[in-house]
Amino acid sequence: MSGTILITGATSGFGQATAQRFVKEGWKVIGTGRRAERLEALSAELGSAFHGVAFDITDEEATKKALAGLPDGFRDIDILVNNAGLALGTAPAPQVPLKDWQTMVDTNITGLLNVTHHLLPTLIERKGIVINLSSVAAHYPYLGGNVYGGTKAFLRQFSLGLRSDLHGKGVRVTSIEPGMCETEFTLVRTGGNQEASDNLYKGVNPITADDIANTIHWVASQPKHININSLELMPVNQSFAGFQVYRES
């Protein structure tokens, strides 16, 4: 199986690894992101099978313009991977700047909706696949996860609702929900604190970007009569935390 796939957030982590995997498998890949220089480097690495488009998915007009301007040979999109997303900060809710919450909502939710809404007609026409990158944070709350977890819960529910709305049209929708993954994600979350990022994953043997790329490829490779509704995965060394209990004195 091969075709054309669009991956948001292709400048690093899951998105970059997924672009590399799908080009290797013979697909045409459209990679989006805000860092044009990284898209140019990826294009130099992957060749003519990769087309990079630099724009901000939170900007509705920029999204429309960028996607409407895709060149011939890259317009018939079979798979949309909504990967772009971020978490900012690890502090409890009362200590988080409102701007950080707004940025997470804008990127993780609004940006995803902008891209998905624009591409739905093509995906319906081609009986395509929508793959949304959610998180185990959609299910399991943790300290400092407040708005980030809320945005990922939205992605999971949106995936289920979209699948319901598109029932009978042959479009498949999947929510992939990873646990601890070692990418730039934590470096961004900690404001560039490399030591804090390294310590988080020390001794964990976390999920890698290649693991997620392989998972996305597996989902996309299923027979057309099978829909993977959701797929939750964790490293073996990660499990479930106990409930917090506050004891009054």
Curated annotation (Swiss-Prot):
Catalytic activity: L-serine + NADP(+) = aminoacetaldehyde + CO2 + NADPH
Species this protein is from: Rhizobium radiobacter
Gene3D superfamilies according to UniProt: NAD(P)-binding Rossmann-like Domain
Pfam families associated with the record: adh_short
Top-level lineage group: Bacteria
Amino-acid positions noted as binding substrate in the UniProt annotation, renumbered to this chain: 135
A GO molecular-function annotation: serine 3-dehydrogenase activity
Subunit and partners: Homotetramer.
Influence of pH: Optimum pH is 9.1.
Protein name as catalogued: Serine 3-dehydrogenase
InterPro entries given in the database record: NAD(P)-bd_dom_sf, Sc_DH/Rdtase_CS, SDR_fam
Biological role: Catalyzes the oxidation of the hydroxyl group of serine to form 2-aminomalonate semialdehyde which is spontaneously converted into 2-aminoacetaldehyde and CO(2). Also acts on D-serine, L-glycerate, D-glycerate and 2-methyl-DL-serine. Does not act on O-methyl-DL-serine and L-threonine.
Cross-referenced PROSITE patterns: ADH_SHORT
